[in-house]
Curated annotation (Swiss-Prot):
Signal peptide: none annotated. The keyword ATP-binding applies. It comes from Ralstonia nicotianae (strain ATCC BAA-1114 / GMI1000). The Walker A ATP-binding motif also binds Pi and PPi. Its cofactor is Mg(2+). This is HPr kinase/phosphorylase. CDD domains: HprK_C (cd01918). Both phosphorylation and phosphorolysis are carried out by the same active site and suggest a common mechanism for both reactions. Catalyzes the ATP- as well as the pyrophosphate-dependent phosphorylation of a specific serine residue in HPr, a phosphocarrier protein of the phosphoenolpyruvate-dependent sugar phosphotransferase system (PTS). HprK/P also catalyzes the pyrophosphate-producing, inorganic phosphate-dependent dephosphorylation (phosphorolysis) of seryl-phosphorylated HPr (P-Ser-HPr). ATP binds at residues 161-168. The keyword Transmembrane does not apply. InterPro entries: HPr(Ser)_kin/Pase, Hpr_kin/Pase_C, Hpr_kin/Pase_Hpr_N, P-loop_NTPase, Ser_kin/Pase_Hpr-like_N_sf. Belongs to the HPrK/P family. Mg(2+) binds at residues 168, 210.
Amino acid sequence: MELTGVTAQSIFDDNAADLKLSWVAGLEGADRAFDVDFAKEATSAADLVGHLNLIHPNRIQVLGKPEITYYQRLSEENRKRQMGELILLEPPFLVVADGVDPPPDLELRCTRSSTPLFTSPISSAAVIDHLRLYLSRISAPRVTMHGVFLDILGMGVLIMGDSGLGKSELGLELISRGHGLVADDAVDFVRLGPDFIEGRCPPLLQNLLEVRGLGLLDIKTIFGETAVRRKMKIKLIVQLVRRNDGEFERLPLDSQYMDVLGLPIHMVKIQVAAGRNLAVLVEAAVRNTILRLRGIDTLRDFMDRQRAAMQAEAASHSPQGRLL
């Protein structure tokens, strides 16, 4: 996993409010980070954070009430040996959760070794789950794409096309028809799972839509809270193309896809021409995609129907054989 620039300080700053973290020792270790080789070998965030485990010393170590109870039952010699082995390998930081006070000798050892030590009143399991989700997000593959990203009938749809084709105007019309804006112009996509890509709006462009001749429109202010969305999973790409009959396939036999972060996303192409109601066409494309996801393929059904008709016609014209 890619965790360049992720330090104890950055993790603390991003999660202090949610986890109610307090930094009690090891302030000098603010730049402490994951071991590079360990981070590269990690297959998921579950490898990067967990309960106290000396077998995996390079991950974030979370100590709840059971771990602290176990630690306090150890002899002083065993405490020094086990914590010495752990801290020697420089974990990013330690978290004492469940509202338990860290043992004084553990706090002292963290101070002397510049190992960040945090405390949290939240349960250790919740701390681990939260940090795993956080690390999954910041380490996930991501890309910024140009277009208008909308929630249409509950489906994340990215409208793309050359400049001047009317993407923003189309987005505005769809919003006026009750659909929701996620992002305009720049959309940040992040792959959070094997078949899960989430799109969000950069904070600077939140709720804004740029329309030629009108300038910037604050969609949330104009249309209300229900006209904007924070995030959506991308399921469909609508590519607007200029009218060029020589290159446009009216009835594509094979589904078209666009690769986004290594995942094929279903794509439809719509020609832009005078008199065409693009908003209705996009809504129809979304409804058709919903049917395809349910296993209903209109084109395939038509081809099967046509094939059956041709076979029936061929059978009706076949020679009947002669009686001898």
